[in-house]
Amino acid sequence: MTGSGLANLSELIRAAGKACVAVALLCGLWTASAEALTLQSIGNFEGPIYVTSAPSNPDRLFVVERQGRIVQVENGTRTVFADLRSIVNDDGEGGLLSIALSPDFQSSGRLYVYYTGKEKTPAEIHVAEMRASGGIVPLSSLRNLLTIEHPKHTNHYGGQLQFGPEGNLFIGTGDGGGSNDQEQNAQDLESELGKILRIDPDTDGVIVFSIPPGNPFGPSPIWSYGLRNPFRFSFDRLTGALAIGDVGQDLREEVDYAPFPGLGVGANYGWNCREGFLAETVPPEPGCAGGGPYTDPIFDYPNPNPGCAAIIGGYVARNASYGDLYGRYLYSDNCSGQIRSLLPSLPFAGGDRSEGLEVAGIDSFGEDSCGRLYAVSGAGPVYRLVGPGGESCAPQAQQPELKSSFVGIRALRRKVKRNKRAFITAFVSPCDGRRGQPVSLWEGRRRIGTRHLDRVCSVRFRPRIKHRVRFRATVKSDGTYVEATSRKLKIRILRRR
């Protein structure tokens, strides 16, 4: 950062916040938990890597084993719920990495699996739908939704599936592996690696999935990008906020945070141009010069041991039994196993502290449908985290409901002489209280500009027209109204006669 940059007050605040995160001891943030958290064993499994519960039954747990099994645990009884070992390749960091049960699982039996397959070496990433029948999930029910090539390396597969607060399926993919994103995938909007993806899997069967309204890059599942290996992410069951644990390379591990309802739509989290709060390398990586803007993490920490650090992102504790842990975000590190928590907020997290527990070889956290949290060790044990209030089960949190929104777009003329400007107006409805809200104009995946709504909730753009083009306008959610996208507006070149 230059001296002139630090002269700006906002840059000073930003620098101070980063310094507090980076040198937490000096800022008094590294504290100890005031109330005891304990581990209660659920049992030992074969290479467990994830745990979740049925949406309507928090005592019906599903433990995911990396080699390809899903084991159901209910009232102390174990059954093999699904067995994908014949199609799962667990070389390197691959395997069956997580599952997500559909919100209507009780009636539909649908669940979604994230795994690396045996068809190719290195393995491709698959996201597939399966259906339970008679208390088990037959392999024959598998329906592939998404295949992502991963041709160079057997690491950085990502692996998280999670339904968001609006009912769409979010998917976390790594950058393709190797060091320093050699293939430049994370910054490439043509690649689905190094991304958070967002799809709607609830289709009529004619198409395998659809792109939900509001995805920022046209007909693409990409929601946000610039991630190295977002192995674990989660949504706050009370507020809907998205928290991502992105595994760093040699220097920093980071937590990225995006409040509901925006959830980081279109965000570029910076990799491989940035690592944590650290700025671009000099000289910049290919494709990074003049890039950005980047969305900084709310927290990062240095690799404690060279070559050994991997953040394990967790959940915001929302069960009342957790005492003063309530509202704090849990995370750990695969190398240290120490369970820690922080207070998630923008622009910087606060109050990072140890919870006084270690889980050797921790690979994941989990959450059941009443907000109780779990820790999973790849060595075999799965634990429930028990707070001072015991094992009480809180009711399902209600997600905030937003009002519907409409964006219109029109042009003074649909035909314009080449290299002349078009006069385009975009407007939103309802208008109440939305003055000053930003509206963006897009040509395909390229944002032409952003303007703020006037008192009658309209904005005007004057793009220069060089060829036939289609525009669309978008408005993000403001916490009251949902995000919305206009129809496409076609502008043609006026031919001389």
Spans of features found by a protein language model:
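Surface-exposed loop and turn segments in beta-propeller and other repeat-based domains
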Residues: 79-92, 141-157, 203-223, 269-306
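Conserved blade-ending motifs and adjacent loop-strand segments that build the rim/top face
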Residues: 348-369
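Enriched for extracellular/lumenal, surface-exposed ectodomains of secreted and cell-surface proteins
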Residues: 467-487
